[in-house]
UniProtKB/Swiss-Prot annotation:
InterPro entries: CheD-like_sf, Chemorcpt_Glu_NH3ase_CheD, Cytotoxic_necrot_fac-like_cat. Its EC number is 3.5.1.44. It comes from the Bacteria. It holds the Pfam family CheD. This is Probable chemoreceptor glutamine deamidase CheD. It catalyses: L-glutaminyl-[protein] + H2O = L-glutamyl-[protein] + NH4(+). One of its GO terms (molecular function) is protein-glutamine glutaminase activity. Keywords: Chemotaxis, Hydrolase. Belongs to the CheD family. Probably deamidates glutamine residues to glutamate on methyl-accepting chemotaxis receptors (MCPs), playing an important role in chemotaxis.
């Protein structure tokens, strides 16, 4: 079987079964969320931009927000036969890509995104197995659904598995 590499854009999500890969690039302050069911060999990847949808009205793309994307991704995985209790998460991104003289939480969107993703995963009872968060460099996330492995390519730092 040919292994497909399925792209996940910014404010996007997708699902795949073994042996395919889900890939998202451009994780700066954004956070990539890989959810995997080892029993079924099925996973999903979301690329969120913002932590919280409650400050917005007329939301056209719910996947942009951590609080909406995670439940939607879980729902899509359940439609494929995944048992939510089997899901495990690996997350990456949440960098501070810009230096501001005001270091307030309002400006630190990367940190806020990371915290929001952790909060919604906990609320959904999905444990986080590993993470690669923070710093000040962009990342690419490569999620291999054959084993649930996630490789992170960080600008200027090479590739590591989380």
């Amino acid at each position: 079987m040919e292994i497909k590499e399925i792209k996940v854009g910014i404010a996007d999500m997708n699902t795949a079964g073994s042996p395919h890969r889900l890939i998202t690039i451009g994780l700066g302050s954004c956070v990539g969320i890989a959810l995997y069911d080892k029993v079924k060999g099925i996973g999903g990847l979301a690329h969120i931009m913002l932590p919280d949808s409650t400050q917005f009205s007329n939301i056209k793309n719910p996947v942009k927000f951590a609080d909406l994307a995670v439940p939607l991704l879980i729902k899509d995985l359940e439609k494929l036969g995944v048992n939510k209790r089997n899901l495990k998460a690996k997350i990456a991104g949440g960098a501070s890509m810009f230096n501001f003289s005001d270091k307030s939480m309002i400006m630190d969107i990367g940190n806020r995104n990371s915290a929001a993703v952790k909060k919604i995963l906990e609320k959904c009872s999905v444990p986080i197995l590993s993470e690669d968060l923070g710093g000040n460099k962009g990342r690419t996330m490569i999620f291999d659904t054959s084993q649930g492995g996630v490789k992170i390519r960080t600008v200027g730092m090479g590739i590591k598995e989380i």
